[in-house]
């Protein structure tokens, strides 16, 4: 897979200490972008194409098993079996440096139908090696406010930003806007890596205010509180994790890896004809989730939910 030389690219931001930097705005202000929606879309496309090509090559050329089972998820599922009350499981992790504070958007109903179809196709092939993310846990991470801390630290950061400010941030992208003003995500594509599968999107370039503009504005509002923000790896990407690998037996043989790539490429070929779009926060407002979020969480567990 090659990328046109004309496409705008922007480097991802690696995880680091708390900072006053607004990486989202830096992308918009870059001379190659200048806030133009088409360039925003190109940045997301370029990142996705490079990542996908690298992963396909990894699976296709692998002399050994390319899949790494998610040990954290395996341990989490084992804890759930011993202690079915998820709240108690998360409470046991509250004092560890594994918790995050993130603003999420939920997929709309039509995208959930698409996701269900994709999950089934991959699960039918791979079997028990793949853990399917439950529907109620599916989400899109819009921006992160604090990364990998005890819950007490996250709550201190939230207090400094201010609950009223966060509420305004959530409302700014929520159902109080008319449909044509809300950012849209288009052109879904199934992405893969050694840990799992995800459905990625790119911002619609037919509107002046894109999904990335929303991310930049929300981050600006958080910084306006005086807080410094530490984030996980951040990239021009909009994706929903659909499943994670908890085994790799299927991928031990060349045929398994070949068949997996064939199914993924067939899914993506079918997706190219899809005209549906995701209007962010059209059906449900944005939400702030705080705690152990690595494997998703139900909307009812949100600390703050966007309203009008």
Labelled PLM ranges:
Residues 2-308:
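Histidine-dependent nucleotide/RNA phosphoesterase domain, centered on the 2H-phosphoesterase fold
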């Amino acid at each position: 897979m090659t990328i046109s030389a004309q496409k705008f690219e922007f480097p991802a931001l690696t995880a680091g200490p708390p900072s006053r930097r607004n990486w989202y705005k830096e992308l918009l202000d870059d001379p190659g972008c200048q806030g133009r929606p088409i360039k925003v879309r190109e940045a997301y496309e370029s990142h996705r194409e490079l990542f996908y090509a690298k992963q396909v090559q990894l699976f296709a050329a692998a002399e050994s098993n390319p899949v790494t089972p998610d040990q954290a998820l395996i341990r989490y599922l084992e804890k759930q079996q011993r202690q079915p009350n998820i709240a108690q499981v998360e409470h046991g992790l509250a004092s560890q440096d594994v918790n995050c504070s993130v603003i999420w958007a939920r997929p709309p109903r039509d995208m959930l139908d698409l996701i269900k179809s994709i999950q089934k196709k991959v699960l039918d092939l791979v079997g028990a090696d793949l853990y399917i993310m439950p529907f109620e846990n599916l989400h899109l991470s819009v921006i992160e406010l604090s990364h990998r801390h005890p819950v007490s630290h996250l709550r201190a950061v939230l207090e400094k930003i201010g609950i009223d400010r966060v509420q305004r941030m959530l409302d700014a992208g929520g159902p109080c806007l008319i449909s044509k003003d809300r950012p849209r995500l288009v052109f879904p594509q199934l992405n893969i890596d050694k840990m799992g599968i995800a459905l990625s999107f790119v911002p619609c370039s037919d509107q002046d205010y894109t999904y990335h503009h929303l991310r930049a504005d929300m981050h600006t509002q958080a910084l306006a509180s005086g807080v410094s923000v530490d984030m996980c790896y951040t990239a021009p990407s909009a994706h929903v994790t659909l499943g994670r690998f908890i085994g790799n037996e299927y991928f031990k043989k060349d045929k398994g890896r070949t068949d997996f790539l064939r199914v993924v490429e067939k899914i993506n070929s079918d997706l190219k004809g899809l005209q549906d779009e995701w209007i962010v926060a059209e059906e449900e407002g944005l939400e702030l989730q705080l705690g152990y979020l690595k494997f998703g969480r139900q909307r009812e567990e949100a600390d703050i939910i966007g309203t009008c």
